[in-house]
């Protein structure tokens, strides 16, 4: 009798080994959905890591090149790389990429900051490797020029960007500008191909 009462009074709960009946609040469909989404979340995290790795590489390359140019080229004669066709010459640019809009330094600073915020928001839904590379180039380039605008003379948010790559019959630019242009071109190509940042493909 005591044995029967003990059996009847024992609740159906998992034992120490994790065995027993299923929890009343368990949702098999939800658990299956979470298991299916787990690889997708992992892939998304990897794409975000690629984005920031590309951005960091572009940013450090731009920053290092500018520091070297300021130390070795500023107030010195330009260095000819390919005759007159390509030279390195230190130029302070208060405008946008390739020397455009020098009277709107603060506006371009705000635009660069807005681009960084937009990229950070897109990163949350990023599942495409090409998009990760493109956005990483944009982010690294925007950060590179924004750093100049914040920390260089004549003042905060009005600083002049250091440009030094001077092709013949073309505007002087820097590596941050190159990263921004390459990232923009890649985004245009991806958009024409119908590939979205979340990895979905649209075919017309």
Curated annotation (Swiss-Prot):
The keyword Protease applies. It comes from Streptomyces coelicolor (strain ATCC BAA-471 / A3(2) / M145). The chain crosses the membrane at residues 50-70, 100-120, 126-146, 170-190. PANTHER family: LIPOPROTEIN SIGNAL PEPTIDASE. The gene is lspA. One of its GO terms (cellular component) is plasma membrane. This protein specifically catalyzes the removal of signal peptides from prolipoproteins. InterPro entries: Peptidase_A8. Keywords: Aspartyl protease, Cell membrane, Hydrolase, Membrane, Protease, Transmembrane, Transmembrane helix. PROSITE patterns: SPASE_II. Residues 20-42 have a biased composition (Basic and acidic residues). Belongs to the peptidase A8 family. GO terms for biological process: proteolysis. It comes from the Bacteria. HAMAP family: LspA. It is found in: Cell membrane. Pathway: Protein modification; lipoprotein biosynthesis (signal peptide cleavage). This is Lipoprotein signal peptidase. Residues 1-42 are annotated as: Disordered. Its EC number is 3.4.23.36. It is a multi-pass membrane protein. The keyword Membrane applies. GO terms for molecular function: aspartic-type endopeptidase activity; endopeptidase activity. The active site is at residues 163, 177. It catalyses: Release of signal peptides from bacterial membrane prolipoproteins. Hydrolyzes -Xaa-Yaa-Zaa-|-(S,diacylglyceryl)Cys-, in which Xaa is hydrophobic (preferably Leu), and Yaa (Ala or Ser) and Zaa (Gly or Ala) have small, neutral side chains.
């Amino acid at each position: 009798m005591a044995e029967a009462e003990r059996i009847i009074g024992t609740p159906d709960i998992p034992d120490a080994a994790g065995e027993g009946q299923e929890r009343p609040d368990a949702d098999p469909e939800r658990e299956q959905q979470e298991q299916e989404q787990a690889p997708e979340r992992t892939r998304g995290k990897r794409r975000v890591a690629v984005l920031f790795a590309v951005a960091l590489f572009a940013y450090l390359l731009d920053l290092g090149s500018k520091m070297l140019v300021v130390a070795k080229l500023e107030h010195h004669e330009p260095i000819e790389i390919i005759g007159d066709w390509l030279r390195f010459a230190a130029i302070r640019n208060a405008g946008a990429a390739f020397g455009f809009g020098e009277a709107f330094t603060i506006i371009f600073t705000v635009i660069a900051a807005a681009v960084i915020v937009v990229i950070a928001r897109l990163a949350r839904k990023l599942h495409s490797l090409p998009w990760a590379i493109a956005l990483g180039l944009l982010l690294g380039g925007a950060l590179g020029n924004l750093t100049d605008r914040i920390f260089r003379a004549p003042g905060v948010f009005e600083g002049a960007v250091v440009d030094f790559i001077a092709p013949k019959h073309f505007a002087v630019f820097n590596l941050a500008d190159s990263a921004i242009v390459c990232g923009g071109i890649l985004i245009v190509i991806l958009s024409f191909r119908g590939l979205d940042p979340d990895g979905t493909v649209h075919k017309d």
